[in-house]
């Protein structure tokens, strides 16, 4: 559990947009969550303006498309091939699913909001071989999609100290910001404008919370920033104009660990930003909704 601090609870009547959740999704083990339908309805009942879910492979893409047949109002999705997908998909399935995923994003551009989540995760990929594979696939994605004029949603996770590749101790991937630097170099290589890129569930390092917004990137603050200072401090000095809010549910609960989060808890992201920036929650609510609408070009139905 996080250390208790005196952060005000989310105020009533806030408007909000969760720009990154995983609803619907296959139910987690030890499932304690309301049904997908109940989570969706509660989200809008409490002030949600639009809900964006992130797919990570063909299975979650198909799951989402099926859900949207019943619950598609003010609900959209991003189409991703996550770094975990690269690392964990069995070889016998990978080539066909990759081919099908590419075909979908190229032939169905009107159905999804952005490409993502995509990126690098050196927690899940711990060897140089696996990390290099993630880099190669990310480059392929940019090469094949850069002309689609879609935004990108990045999954960025640096290796922790205990996750360094001991067989290649001096490799650049082992640095505390190794993933950040690698991704910035790749974006530059493929001439991807920062204004097209959102760093989902931004986790730092702290200096990047200052420099990335100055370059034009958008940073997403998770609901866990409410109860866990390590998530809150990395955007403490980021301008509000560069921030959006997310839950990454069912993980990243505001003050608990485990698969317990729901999209309506994005209100806690608003409360966390208001606390770290010392500004009213209503101001954060209004600006982050505006930022999300602008980034994704959302059309909200009344």
Residue ranges and their predicted role:
Residues 1-302:
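Mid-domain alpha/beta scaffold segments of enzyme catalytic cores
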